[in-house]
Amino acid sequence: GVPDRVGEHAARHQARHAGTEATPHSHAAHARVTDPRDATDVDFDEVNNKQHYALYSVFALGESLPADDGERGRIIAESLDYVKGAGAEIRGFYDVSGFRAEADLMVWWLDDDPEVLQDAYHRLRASALGKFLDPVWSCMGLHTPAEFNKRHIPACFGGVAPRDWAMVYPFVRSYDWYLKAPEERARIMAEHGRNGFAQYPDVKGSTLSAFGFSDYEWVLAFEADSLDRLEGVMHAQRYTEARLYVREDTPFFTGPRVSLGEWAERQPRA
């Protein structure tokens, strides 16, 4: 049957915040503490001096999966093995069903070689599972050193373990943004940070460059252990001057991290 992920999450949340009186939305409940899931020996210079790519690919279930448990399990196992053969790291599969009517599955891949990511994508589409999937959206991003703080690196390349939920979206800056003085952009982005991650330190962000890769300039992924934290940081960042310099920041794809087998168990069968 389908694992009780709600119960599992509740248990994890209770364990993390045992002994506190904070509400789920309070910032006291998410103080800056070292999370044992994360690496603490990350070399920022090494990360910045190498190329690191991510690929976010979203699919819809085009037709129902087989009703036979054995056949369905075989499809998932064989497809997963085939996709892993590309060599790309799979940061997560995400169930995005219900958040958008046209999407069901998001895959987040990581690698230092963009062609390896392409191979992983091709393999998924060519796999037994791929025959049931229709492409909806895909975007590749590249880590480039942050303009104002070289020690700010994407969570996905900075030793931060995957969280229970992910939100991915692209965005495009206004035409005049890049013509502003660097110190002015730094001031605006500092305020943006104070209204976002400073208030929600448990939310982990990965901002990657996408110039020339697609129709976007940047692609972002936020991760947290509960959905309300993702909503909170996005809402808080609306009250900043930086919002005046955004031309486009859709579509959004959001969902819980699941195994591919879990995802398949939730899908229609025929």
Residue map of PLM features:
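Short S/T/G/P-rich N-terminal loop/turn motif that feeds into the first structured element of a domain
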Residues: P24-K84, D112-L117, D134-A198, F211-F213, ...
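Short linear/disordered segments characteristic of secreted peptide precursors
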Residues: H9-H13
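Short, glycine- and small/hydrophobic-rich beta-strand elements in well-ordered beta-sheets
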Residues: D81-A103, G130-P145, R194-V219, V233, ...
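Short amphipathic alpha-helices in soluble, non-transmembrane regions
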Residues: D119-S127, G232-R238
